[in-house]
């Protein structure tokens, strides 16, 4: 099981290294618009899971949304501290 900070560090490292086998690197290369569309899609799936599919499926969908939000953060050159300042 990964923690939020651990996942962010792993994703940022893949992007820094330009890992050719990484879907994260590919997503960042596709740009903010494509990532943003994925964030919207995943947010809708979280909502639908919460309404109709129960806690386990909701947790799974939330984890996918958090992943895509982290990818968007990396694409925007934000780090966790940038976000934590606003919590």
UniProtKB/Swiss-Prot annotation:
Keyword Calcium carried by entry: no
Location(s) in or outside the cell: Cytoplasm
Entry keyword set: Amino-acid biosynthesis, ATP-binding, Cytoplasm, Histidine biosynthesis, Hydrolase, Nucleotide-binding
Pathway, per record: Amino-acid biosynthesis; L-histidine biosynthesis; L-histidine from 5-phospho-alpha-D-ribose 1-diphosphate: step 2/9
EC nos: 3.6.1.31
GO terms for MF: ATP binding; phosphoribosyl-ATP diphosphatase activity
One BP term from GO: L-histidine biosynthetic process
InterPro entries: HisE (IPR008179), PRib-ATP_PPHydrolase-like (IPR021130)
Short name of one Pfam family: PRA-PH
Catalytic activity: 1-(5-phospho-beta-D-ribosyl)-ATP + H2O = 1-(5-phospho-beta-D-ribosyl)-5'-AMP + diphosphate + H(+)
Entry annotated with the keyword Membrane: no
Any one of the GO CC terms: cytoplasm
Family under the similarity heading: Belongs to the PRA-PH family.
Cross-referenced NCBIfam families: histidine_hisI (TIGR03188), PRK00400.1-1 (NF001610)
Protein name in UniProt: Phosphoribosyl-ATP pyrophosphatase
Organism lineage string: Bacteria, Pseudomonadati, Rhodothermota, Rhodothermia, Rhodothermales
